[in-house]
Amino acid sequence: MDLIQQLEQEEIARLNKVIPVFAPGDTVIVSVNVVEGTRKRLQAYEGVVIAKRNRGLNSSFIVRKISSGEGVERTFQLYSPLIASIEVKRRGDVRRAKLYYLRQRSGKSARIKEKLS
């Protein structure tokens, strides 16, 4: 392990964030800290994880949801201080690491089978 990886591991340990195990296809609820002027509140963002990028401290994931009939995708940094919590609502059974094909689908064809175990 080189010096940069070691520093990243120390930083991850210092943050001591509890991050659940999730994968593409899972439905997650991400609680995001939103600052509006002087007020600070939590905003829940629920959707399907379509991609996950594992790069140590720079890890990120993309969550897609349908809002008012329009597809909305948001990229989150896994160790961002803006993320309060991540909750896995449902496990999806998929055979791909990146689910970008869901962008072209709508309705019933965009559904993901639930993992039974």
From Swiss-Prot:
GO-annotated molecular function: structural constituent of ribosome
GO cellular component: cytosolic large ribosomal subunit
Signal peptide start-end: none
GO biological process: translation
Keywords: Ribonucleoprotein, Ribosomal protein
UniProt-listed Gene3D superfamilies: 2.30.30.790
Lineage top rank: taxon: Bacteria
UniProt-listed Pfam families: Ribosomal_L19 (PF01245)
InterPro entries: Ribosomal_bL19, Ribosomal_bL19_CS, Ribosomal_bL19_sf, Translation_prot_SH3-like_sf
The protein's role, per its UniProt record: This protein is located at the 30S-50S ribosomal subunit interface and may play a role in the structure and function of the aminoacyl-tRNA binding site.
The family this protein is said to belong to: Belongs to the bacterial ribosomal protein bL19 family.
Name of this protein: Large ribosomal subunit protein bL19
Source taxonomy: Bacteria, Pseudomonadati, Pseudomonadota, Betaproteobacteria, Burkholderiales
